[in-house]
Each structure stands twice: as C-alpha cells, then as structure tokens.
UniProtKB/Swiss-Prot annotation:
Keyword field: ATP-binding, Cytoplasm, DNA damage, DNA repair, DNA replication, DNA-binding, Nucleotide-binding, SOS response
GO biological process, one term: DNA synthesis involved in DNA repair
Highest classification ranks of the organism: Bacteria, Pseudomonadati, Spirochaetota, Spirochaetia, Leptospirales
Family as reported in the entry's similarity comment: Belongs to the RecF family.
Subcellular location: Cytoplasm
SUPFAM superfamilies per UniProt: P-loop containing nucleoside triphosphate hydrolases (SSF52540)
Superkingdom of the organism of origin: Bacteria
GO molecular function: ATP binding; single-stranded DNA binding
Pfam families reported for this sequence: SMC_N
One Gene Ontology cellular component annotation held by this UniProt entry: cytoplasm
Protein name: DNA replication and repair protein RecF
Gene that produces this protein: recF
Amino acid sequence: MFLKHLTIQNFRNHEELSLDFDSRLIFFVGDNGEGKTNLLEAICILSWLKSFRESEDSNLIRWGSENYFLRGKIKDNLKESVLEIGFTSKPSVKRKLKFNQEEIKKRTDLIGKFITVLLTPMDLKIIEGGPAERRKFIDAFISSFDPFYLESLLEYNKILKHRNALLKSGNPDISHLSIWDKKIVEKGIFILNKRREVVLELNSFYRVNLDKLSGGKDGLELIYKPNVKDQDEFLEKLNHNLSRDLRLGYTSVGIHRDDLFIGSDQRDITEFGSQGQKRSTVIALKAATFNYYKNILNTIPVLLIDDVIRELDVKRREYFVDLVVTAGQAFFTTTDLEGIQDYVGKLKDQKQIFLIRQGKVESIK
C-alpha cells in the first residue's frame, strides 16, 4: 500500500495542509511540540479510524474550530481510492466517513482499505502494562483485517454488559441469565479460536524476528493464555462462579480475562525483562504483524514510525533498516536528520523530507 496524498484541516495544531507523497521514505523533521507526530496521527486515523494517543475525537480539533477533516489518497497495487473522515463537535457531535465519495455507515466496511503498522515509544505498554493492554493489542490487530471478528468483539462486550447488569441487580431471573450465558459463550468461543489461530502464526514470525535482533539468545515466544479453553469449560465456569459473580456484581470468567504471555519457561519478560529485551520484543512483535499482513494476507502495509530511531542500538537499527527496505512505504518522525542516514543510504533516491515548524510544513531537499 502507498499513501499518495494527505489533506488536513483543523486537526491538532495544523490549520490546513495538502501534502503529496511520491517516495517510499517520508521524514517529518521538527523539534518536540511542533506537530510532526500529529501528521503521523492523522495518517493513523485514516487507517484505524481512531487515534493512537487520544480517545476523544473532540480533543483532536484545532483550538477555536468546530470540526476537523482528513483525506487520504491511497494506492494499492494499481488501484487508487480516496478515504475521507470528518468530525464535527457543534451543534451536535457527528462523524462522517466516505470511501470514493460514497458515505460509509458501518466502520467495518472500511476494514482493510488502508492498512498501517505503527511503532511508537508508547508500545512498551504492551509489555509493561497488564493483560488488558495485551488483549487490546491482539484485538486491534485482528480487527484491522477481519470485520466479523470486530463485530463479534463488539457484540461480546454488549452481552457482557447486559450480564453484568443482571448480576448487579442482586436477584436476577436465572432463566434470563442462562440466555445471556449461551450468547456470551457462543461469541466468546469464536473470539477465543481466532485469537489462538492468529497468535500461533504471529509467534512463528516473532521468534524469527527476535532471533535476528538478539542473535538467538533470548528464546522467547508468544503464548495465548485463555481464561477458558473451550465451550464446555466456559459454561461450566459460568455456572460454578455464579454465586461469586453475584457477590462481585460482574462476570469473573471469560475471554475478557485472557492474556498474551511473552517469555519462556524460565521467565516472563513482562516481569523480568531488561529494557533492551523489552525494546527488542516490541520491535519483533510489531514486525511480526507486518510479516502477517505480507505473508498471510498478501498485502504490504504502510509503516508509521514515531520517533524511535534514536533509541535503537546498532544491531536493532540494522534489523529495522532491512524491515523498512521490504516495506512499500514508511513514514518517520524525528527531531534531527542525523538519525535517518542509515535509512536514506539504501533508498537515497526514494525519500522526501518535510520540515515542521509552528504548524507549518515545508518540503526540503
């Protein structure tokens, strides 16, 4: 995939921008706080339909404005398409999505239209955060290419909310509760099986990537750790834990309690890994998602790399350069030009550099 054009209006600190991209490597260079990551965020929203930094769309609107607008022109093989996102906060909150001038009502209809892989210093929370962060990572990844998975996940969460409301009522009708039990198991088992399948594939890519980064020293792997193993166990645990759930007021078992173990028999990297091991794991993990898109789904995503170049040592940088070379297109943010020379070296005739100052963007040679 290839992003050929980006239009931004009233987004973050950018009033109006129109940028054309004709190269494989795009560098946004500027001091901290100038708005370079905001450009990456805009691209990310066109892909994910949400920000990687902010949960509220209204906080993305430029100060003093009432709406923002994003447009991206995307090329996939020989086919070009246009994706548009508009958000208005006044007089009422409204979001409008368009694909090739046609209004889109369902978010799932845009899945797979523009696929990106993001690497940011914030990714360390996948390792250092709790199970919820790792579930969020795997769910977001699968949802980026499987609309039925996303719909099932949304439905599961609705069912869970209804079941929890019944539990909190203190004296629920057991027959009514059993209806929700059957529904939550049906949706949950589909999600469980899909997570298990995808993590197994990701692990094979992750281990190869990590071996390249660490010289084969770490021996770590990804292991899906479900809270329930199958349909029968799910139902049995729901029944067994009913008294406890009534006391707690929420559902204590299910796929919403799963985890993604990262480590080996000897250690869990989330608890015992060094900072270097954690950085390697994050890079290997994100690269594994890139490998999955490329080798399993036969699509090459756009890479979005937010200010991580300086943090990489020589070995990790060499590996990352090789990854970038195999990508269709990559966008970088950085505070200086020194850190990009390794990338420019192999693709020196395929680069564009944009200097960002006070919300203004200037193309430089």
